[in-house]
Amino acid sequence: MYPPGCAKVKCSWHHCLPGLLLQLLLALCFFSYLRMSQEKPKPKPMWVSELGAPSQATEGSSAHLPLRVLLWTWPFNQPVALSRCSELWPGTADCQLTVNRSEYPQADAVLVHHREVSHRPQMQLPPSPRPPGQRWVWFSMESPSNCLKLKDLDGYFNLTMSYRRDSDIFMPYGWLEPWPSQPVETLLNISAKTKLVAWVVSNWNTDSIRVQYYKLLKPHLQVDVYGRFHTPLPHALMAKQLSQYKFYLAFENSLHPDYITEKLWKNALQAWAVPVVLGPSRVNYEQFLPPKAFIHVEDFQSPKDLAQYLLALDKDYASYLNYFRWRETLRPRSFSWALMFCKACWKLQQEPRYQTVPSIASWFQ
């Protein structure tokens, strides 16, 4: 018996076959969808260089609305040229970067440089109440030894930005990236390197580890020291002057993880001098550089042993050249404030999730 108005339809197999095949196909699609939805999504890697460089090619962000990002103070109160992030960081939608504090109520995010708010944090931070959904980004390129009153900032910030690899927004002082094509830089000119070792140091603290090491080194090795308390060297002439040296003492002012500064990336590498480093461990340096791109003081039992090694390299052309082999495939790049702000812009676009950093101090120190 069938409902009124309905009649039983007889269907031979060759008439029903197309319908059965269609149902089977739909069932297969449905179960494939269920299987895919239950699988863990594979992470989509952000393009970085082989040695941890900031991204130069990122996922398209053109669909994102431009964010208004307020720079609360200039770093060290020194204005810098701001760039269009879509040009400086390909794949990033342009943020409305501003230093006009009157736009604070409308800003999607506020970038706060530590140095300018470290003396009286509660009075120098942006005012309360904070606009709903606004994110604050704490940033600093100084080491913990030079960041005061970090505990006073606990609970205020949503993101961190620094040279530390575990920052929410990682911005190293420098990085290596593959050549976009064949290397275009001229070959190393050994004949121009008529001097042995240079060191530029502005803050001369006699109790610091780097000065103590230098005092043990200098009886065994001639080191030309430049800086405020030694031979003056204008910044505009630094690269030209340092390019005359085979080695450069890239000694950091304090020893902290990932704290590898312009002393290596600019002073040494831009001058084609082999960096002799004193800072974090060799293992830490090798997370940024190939093992044969630098000489670490911890590889030697004493400053005297280091001096003897450098003097031997000075006379061994082939061994000295081995410290430049990495340049055949990689080139050094350097940090800039404009690039840092655009990295923040990119991160804020990619990560809309709201979070709070409970304690800057416990993380950074």
Swiss-Prot record:
Mapped to this chain, the residue ranges on the Lumenal side of the membrane are 35-365
The record lists glycosylation at 100, 158, 189
Record GO terms (molecular function): 3-galactosyl-N-acetylglucosaminide 4-alpha-L-fucosyltransferase activity; 4-galactosyl-N-acetylglucosaminide 3-alpha-L-fucosyltransferase activity; alpha-(1->3)-fucosyltransferase activity
Q: Which UniProt keywords apply?
A: Glycoprotein, Glycosyltransferase, Golgi apparatus, Lipid metabolism, Membrane, Signal-anchor, Transferase, Transmembrane, Transmembrane helix
Protein location: Golgi apparatus, Golgi stack membrane
Q: Which residues lie on this side of the membrane: Cytoplasmic?
A: 1-15
Cystine pairs: none
**Record's bilayer topology term:** Single-pass type II membrane protein
Superkingdom of source: Eukaryota
Q: Tell me the pathway.
A: Protein modification; protein glycosylation
Q: Show the Gene3D superfamilies listed in the entry.
A: Glycosyl transferase family 10, C-terminal domain
Q: Which reaction does it catalyse?
A: a beta-D-galactosyl-(1->3)-N-acetyl-beta-D-glucosaminyl derivative + GDP-beta-L-fucose = a beta-D-galactosyl-(1->3)-[alpha-L-fucosyl-(1->4)]-N-acetyl-beta-D-glucosaminyl derivative + GDP + H(+); an N-acetyl-alpha-neuraminyl-(2->3)-beta-D-galactosyl-(1->4)-N-acetyl-beta-D-glucosaminyl derivative + GDP-beta-L-fucose = an alpha-Neu5Ac-(2->3)-beta-D-Gal-(1->4)-[alpha-L-Fuc-(1->3)]-beta-D-GlcNAc derivative + GDP + H(+); a beta-D-galactosyl-(1->4)-N-acetyl-beta-D-glucosaminyl derivative + GDP-beta-L-fucose = a beta-D-galactosyl-(1->4)-[alpha-L-fucosyl-(1->3)]-N-acetyl-beta-D-glucosaminyl derivative + GDP + H(+); an alpha-Neu5Ac-(2->3)-beta-D-Gal-(1->4)-beta-D-GlcNAc-(1->3)-beta-D-Gal-(1->4)-[alpha-L-Fuc-(1->3)]-beta-D-GlcNAc derivative + GDP-beta-L-fucose = an alpha-Neu5Ac-(2->3)-beta-D-Gal-(1->4)-[alpha-L-Fuc-(1->3)]-beta-D-GlcNAc-(1->3)-beta-D-Gal-(1->4)-[alpha-L-Fuc-(1->3)]-beta-D-GlcNAc derivative + GDP + H(+)
Q: Which SUPFAM superfamilies match?
A: UDP-Glycosyltransferase/glycogen phosphorylase
Q: EC top class, in one word?
A: transferase
Pfam families on file: Glyco_tran_10_N, Glyco_transf_10
On modification after translation, the UniProt record reads:
Glycosylated.
Task: Please give the biological process terms from Gene Ontology that the record holds.
Answer: fucosylation; lipid metabolic process; oligosaccharide metabolic process; positive regulation of cell-cell adhesion; protein N-linked glycosylation; protein O-linked glycosylation; regulation of cell migration; regulation of cell population proliferation
> What the protein does?
Catalyzes the transfer of L-fucose, from a guanosine diphosphate-beta-L-fucose, to both the subterminal N-acetyl glucosamine (GlcNAc) of type 1 chain (beta-D-Gal-(1->3)-beta-D-GlcNAc) glycolipids and oligosaccharides via an alpha(1,4) linkage, and the subterminal glucose (Glc) or GlcNAc of type 2 chain (beta-D-Gal-(1->4)-beta-D-GlcNAc) oligosaccharides via an alpha(1,3) linkage, independently of the presence of terminal alpha-L-fucosyl-(1,2) moieties on the terminal galactose of these acceptors and participates in the blood groups Lewis determination and expression of Lewis a (Le(a)), lewis b (Le(b)), Lewis x/SSEA-1 (Le(x)) and lewis y (Le(y)) antigens.
Q: Which family does it belong to?
A: Belongs to the glycosyltransferase 10 family.
Name of the protein this chain belongs to: 3-galactosyl-N-acetylglucosaminide 4-alpha-L-fucosyltransferase FUT3
Its lineage opens with: Eukaryota, Metazoa, Chordata, Craniata, Vertebrata
Gene for this chain: FUT3
